[in-house]
From Swiss-Prot:
Residues 190-246 are annotated as: Disordered. The lineage of its organism: Eukaryota, Fungi, Dikarya, Ascomycota, Saccharomycotina. [2Fe-2S] cluster binds at residues 281, 295, 298, 300. [4Fe-4S] cluster binds at residues 374, 377, 385, 388. Residues 193-261 are annotated as: Linker. It comes from Candida albicans (strain WO-1) (Yeast). The C-terminal domain binds 2 Fe-S clusters but is otherwise mostly in an intrinsically disordered conformation. The N-terminal domain has structural similarity with S-adenosyl-L-methionine-dependent methyltransferases, but does not bind S-adenosyl-L-methionine. It is required for correct assembly of the 2 Fe-S clusters. Residues 374-388 are annotated as: Fe-S binding site B. It comes from the Eukaryota. This is Fe-S cluster assembly protein DRE2. Transmembrane segments: none annotated. It is found in: Cytoplasm; Mitochondrion intermembrane space. Signal peptide: none annotated. Residues 281-300 are annotated as: Fe-S binding site A.
Length: 411
């Protein structure tokens, strides 16, 4: 029987530039499996007896970017070659770890130049970290251990089978539980039972009503009925809703009471017991001091007085602010008038300088013997001092006449 070992060789981009290094890496892989080299196009296949080794070489950047699609659960080994010794350049992203996990078969291994500071990410991806003895090289000692990431074999979950309950036979006979039986009644029995139920309900309701009425009489709610106050035994009459002593109030009597101002004695006695007048706030109760604030539901007029005081204060403030605004505007107008007068006076006091035609025609600044302190007036502004009379003029020759045109327009 022939068996095959599929190996994926992932190379760092810096390794691909050296062809000899790539061939050395391949030969080491073959030597580790004790096989002979036979190159067949894109993949290298070697056979020894009944074992076939398929070696696939890819650049890791193309695999991570998805340019090259590789089959899942296909490779027995994946070897990563990275010549960088620093740990920061050996870091493998989590997305690449997950892809390698999918490419490997169960119990497949990912080995080579692996990072040492990503063990947590490796375990979270699903790998198991194992240690293997590194192959002997010139710079390495025998027995040196390196980390290898192994894809574990999936464990089959145990299947729980439901079994039927065994029936045990015994000599003792057990009675089976049966549903309750209902007996159908005759018409006479139904009528008698209904009468008994109704009689019991009526007696219970009467007892409950009597007890409730007695409790109401004993509480403070008894002042609503005058008959209950006179009864000493706490019994309640059946005609509680009808009060013979209730007095009927006529609407005309109410109108007459307001018009007569208590002159009508009948109306006054009638309404004095029925009308409720609000109690005025007594200042003397608070030690002669006025209350700070009216009640929430004030009916004595204190709330209206407070609102009137607030409105009066607002009116006073508005008047004062209006007067202040008027005075401020008047002062601003006066200040503006003063400034205008000062500007007019300053313009009148200015002295105008006038030049004659002789002064404007020709001005000779280049008379020999008349030079500045620096002695380089004719050379230009770059060589003139701060107080030079020739500043702004072009270079000239000594004795040359300089004419100033349009000098009068600037005055």
């Amino acid at each position: 029987m022939t068996s095959s070992i599929n190996i994926l060789l992932l190379l760092h981009p810096t390794v691909v530039t050296d062809a000899q290094l790539v061939e050395q890496i391949k030969s080491k892989i073959y030597q580790s499996h004790n096989n002979n080299n036979n190159n067949n196009g894109g993949t290298t296949t070697t056979t020894t007896g009944t074992v076939n080794i398929n070696l696939n070489q890819q650049i890791i950047d193309r695999v991570t970017k998805g340019i090259i699609e590789l089959p899942y659960d296909y490779y027995d080994e994946i070897i990563y070659i990275n010549p960088n010794n620093e740990s920061q350049y050996r870091e493998i992203p989590i997305s690449l770890m997950q892809l390698i996990y999918k490419l490997l078969k169960s119990n497949g291994k990912f080995k080579g130049d692996l990072p040492l500071d990503q063990n947590l990410d490796v375990l979270m991806t699903g790998f198991i970290i194992e240690e293997e003895e590194k192959e002997k090289e010139e710079n390495n000692l025998e027995g040196e251990l390196v980390n290898v990431w192994v894809k574990p074999i999936p464990v089959d979950e145990p299947v729980v089978t439901l079994l039927k309950k065994k029936t045990t036979t015994s000599n003792t006979t057990t009675k089976k539980k049966s549903l309750p039986l209902f007996k159908k009644l005759n018409k006479d029995e139904i009528n008698n039972s209904d009468k008994d139920i109704n009689n019991d309900n009526i007696t219970n309701n009467n007892n409950n009503n009597n007890n409730n009425k007695r409790k109401l009489v004993e509480t403070k709610l008894t002042y609503f009925s005058s008959d209950d106050e006179n009864s000493s035994d706490g019994s309640v009459s059946e005609n509680d809703d009808i009060d013979d002593d209730d007095e009927l109030i006529d609407e005309n009597d109410l109108l007459n009471f307001n018009n007569n101002n208590n002159n009508n004695t009948n109306g006054g006695s009638l309404l004095s017991d029925k009308l409720i007048t609000p109690r005025k706030c007594d200042i003397s109760l608070n030690g002669g001091k006025k209350r700070k604030k009216a009640c929430k539901d004030c009916t004595c007029g204190l709330k209206e007085l407070e609102e009137l005081e607030v409105s009066n204060q607002q009116n006073l403030q508005d008047q004062i602010l209006g007067k202040l605004a008027q005075s401020a505007t008047l002062e601003a107008i006066k200040i503006e008038e003063r400034l205008k007068q000062q500007q007019q006076q300053q313009q009148q006091q200015k002295v105008k300088v006038k030049f004659t035609e002789e002064d404007l025609s020709e001005i000779d600044f280049t008379v020999q013997g008349k030079t500045g302190g620096c002695g380089s007036c004719a050379l230009g502004d770059a060589f003139r001092c701060d107080g030079c009379p020739y500043l702004g003029l072009p270079p000239f020759k000594p004795g040359e006449v300089v004419k100033l045109d349009g000098f009068g327009e600037d005055i």
